[in-house]
Amino acid sequence: MFDAVIDVIVLGGGPAGLTAATYLRRFHRSCLVIDAGDSRARWIPESNNCPGFPNGVSGVELLRRMRQQATEFGTQFESQLVDRVALSDGVFTLSSGSRSWRAHRVILATGISDRLPDAPWVEEAVACHALRLCSICDAYEASDSRIGVYGPLADIAAHGLFLRSYSEQVFLVPSDDAEGGSALLEAKAAGVRVLEYGGTLGFDGSRCSYTLGDGRVELFDSIYPFLGADTSAGIVAGLGAALSEKGELLVDRHQMTTVPGLYAIGDIVSGLNQISVAVGQAALAATHLHNALPFAPRISRGAKDT
């Protein structure tokens, strides 16, 4: 596909990476997207806060449209899981097994992977909105319903308080027996209820449940799990890229990491994990990157280049 060093490799084919690719190709920069096919967006059954979709859009459909748009402008794709990123003499080399690609710049857009309850029904519950993964994205749809918030008590108290502005019936479902601290006191004062630790999560095909030790069952229209997330930012830690305490890549106002020429966008950086934010970060990174690359005067070819 590319025998020489190309301008940019975008690692990750979610909303952030696909937006960056579209921008880069419209800047007439050679661009390859390497994607493992596991974008977090694919879990979204329907998004109603994504601009331009008044009737909502599924994550799968949004990804399809964004990939189609990037392809229309000549973006090339590889379906691979990159396991190594190296830098030598100003050129990045990305490797997957015995295969490798080289580029002058890299945009890391690999996102994060949510830690979900260890249960066989998780995908089905997400698909029917019984298990929701983003309170900022879809708490509006859960308004005035019974909402559970599942995870370590110290972590979920603040989330429960946030959700209290959407419903009168918010329950903290602890995955541990730790103390909740001041955040828990604030949540309780706002009317958030706390269930006993040690129960069992369940799903009946349409609603999630929590069975307590004494046999009582609490049913929820939706449960939000907050169990943390895993990131692949470590793949560039060997290059000297600085990470936050949470393992997120630290970037400047242009989305460049502490490694010159290496950019990061989307959920892999610190900030609000929203598609709209990721798209904006992609525009910033792609534009700065384009202007930082050597000037390439246009030679008319009479047709679109590829």
Kindly label every feature range from the protein language model:
Residues G12, A109-G111, L116, Y150, ...:
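Short, well-ordered coil/turn residues at beta-beta hairpins
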Residues E124-E141, L227-L272, S276, L284, ...:
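FAD-site-proximal beta/loop scaffold in flavoenzymes
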Residues S30, A36-D38, P45-E72, C134, ...:
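N-terminal glycine-rich dinucleotide-binding loop that anchors FAD/FMN and/or NAD(P) in oxidoreductases
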Residues M1-I6, F77-S145, S222, A237, ...:
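FAD-binding core/adjacent interface of flavoenzyme oxidoreductases
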Residues I6-E61, S145, P152-A178:
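Beta1-alpha1 glycine-rich phosphate/pyrophosphate-binding loop at the start
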Residues A70-D89, T93-S95, W101-A103, S167-E248, ...:
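A Rossmann-like FAD-binding core segment of flavoenzymes
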Residues M1-D7, R64, S300:
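Extreme N-terminal leader/targeting segments of oxidoreductases
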